[in-house]
Design a protein with these regions (language model features):
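Non-catalytic, mostly N-terminal accessory regions of nucleic-acid modification and defense proteins
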Residues: 1-254
């Protein structure tokens, strides 16, 4: 499907992409509406399993704030259409916490939503970047940050398999991906005085172009979820990307 930007009526109010209801235009609502569309266009989640502003229960009681207002998850993705229609907290796949651009808080809220529902994980986004978490396994309590949000029907447990180039999904919201990449690199480079963010972005893009345009069934610009969890795996992926950039640069020495 094509990416749909935020819809507004003639009065400047937001038209909810899920229900058609009229909503107040706020920075946070814009982030939420855009991410609902990204879930569909880039990750393949059907519209009929996505819900906006869902009350979160603790046992049989709906959680509330200090002032008595219901606590609601910004976006909930259910396991099925039926679960979404019934707002079945026992069949939630993951939850999303949305914040206005440049905000950094909200992790503790996301944790609360995940552990009070059946969710296997959750997403935090401020529209400029995204962090994805899943529940720890093996009896441990807590969350692990994972590399990327699984697409619809993909396994949240991660995989060592690498898809062929022909199987790679085509992103629709490239601006969001570039913004996320920028923010990850910025966070990594803040402690390095010699870090050149713009050039690192360019090097990564050129390495990706080299990988996409050279023969070979499988991508080299790739890291598996299991490799991402180890320093050795991340180092190997970084080395391969550096090789790709050098291959590109050698073709255009000037």
């Amino acid at each position: 499907m094509e990416l749909i930007e935020v819809n507004f009526n003639d009065e400047g109010d937001i038209i909810d992409t899920l229900s058609g209801k009229i909503l107040k235009d706020t920075p946070e609502e814009r982030v939420r509406q855009r991410f609902i569309n990204i879930l569909q266009s880039d990750y393949g989640y059907p519209k009929n399993i996505i819900a906006r502003e869902v009350p979160v229960q603790q046992g049989s009681k709906i959680l509330s704030s200090d002032d008595g207002a219901e606590i609601r998850a910004d976006i909930v993705v259910y396991t099925s259409k039926k679960a979404c229609l019934e707002r079945d907290q026992g069949n939630i796949l993951f939850v999303v916490e949305c914040k206005k651009p440049n905000a950094t808080e909200g992790y503790s809220q996301l944790v609360s939503y995940i552990f009070n529902t059946s969710a296997v994980g959750g997403v935090w986004t401020n529209g400029n970047g995204i962090s994805v978490y899943k529940k720890k396994t093996g009896g441990e309590v807590g969350l692990d940050e994972i590399l990327t949000l699984p697409r619809y029907r993909e396994n949240w447990s991660g995989s060592d398999s690498i898809p062929s180039k022909s199987e790679l999904p085509r992103p629709h919201n490239v601006r969001f991906l570039l913004s996320s990449c920028h923010n990850k690199l910025y966070g990594r480079g803040m402690e390095n005085e010699d870090f050149d963010l713009a050039m690192d972005m360019v090097r990564n893009l050129l390495a990706k172009i080299q990988d996409e345009t050279t023969p070979g069934e499988f991508p080299r610009f790739w890291i598996t979820e299991n490799d991402f969890q180890t320093a050795e795996g991340r180092k190997h992926a970084a080395t391969e990307i550096q090789k790709l950039f050098r291959e590109y640069a050698d073709q255009f020495p000037d």
